[in-house]
Amino acid sequence: MKLNEIKTSKDVYRFIDDNIAYGWIDINNQQHLNTMKEFRRIYRTMSVEEILKYKLGTCIEQVNLMHYLLNKINVKNKMYCCRIFEPDDYGNLEEEEHMHCFILYYENGKVYHMEHPNLDRKGIYEYNSESEAIKAIVDYYIELRGGKESPTKEFFEVPVGISFKEFNKYINHV
């Protein structure tokens, strides 16, 4: 599927599934596919244009691309970040990151969760309400994180070119 062929929310998912891999570009413009090694040290967020150019993204970029594409076809949507809280000055660059961004969209009186970056849960999930969707998603990540609380916040944009630490700080203050 090509970008100009996207007409429906299912087309958005199909486009991302056909064209976007899980990965990221570092500060040296090197690609990292299916690995988070050195992520806290050298990751930077990408623009929508860069995501489309490199055909990859973490949950942050993939959700931002879904948001962009859903907006283009006038489908209401919201971006969220679910994570174990880290203060603004958190400095352990060796620790695994415990964050997942996701998107909900709204059609026909229902709420849908479009999941692509989490390879174990790829797909579109239907819910009766926003609160039901958020609870199901957050509960999944709390269980995955061994019961650790995972505060979830809506966010409205992805600043381009910032580090993981800076993105975390941005989410802290949204």
What are these model-derived regions, one by one?
Residues 1-54:
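Secondary-structure boundary elements
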Residues 15, 133-140, 166, 170:
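Charge-rich, solvent-exposed alpha-helical interaction surfaces
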Residues 54, 58-61:
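Mid-length scaffold segments of soluble, non-membrane domains
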Residues 61-143:
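Hydrophobic/aromatic-rich core segments of domains that either
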Residues 89-91, 142-174:
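Alpha-helical and coiled-coil interaction segments, frequently adjacent to or embedded
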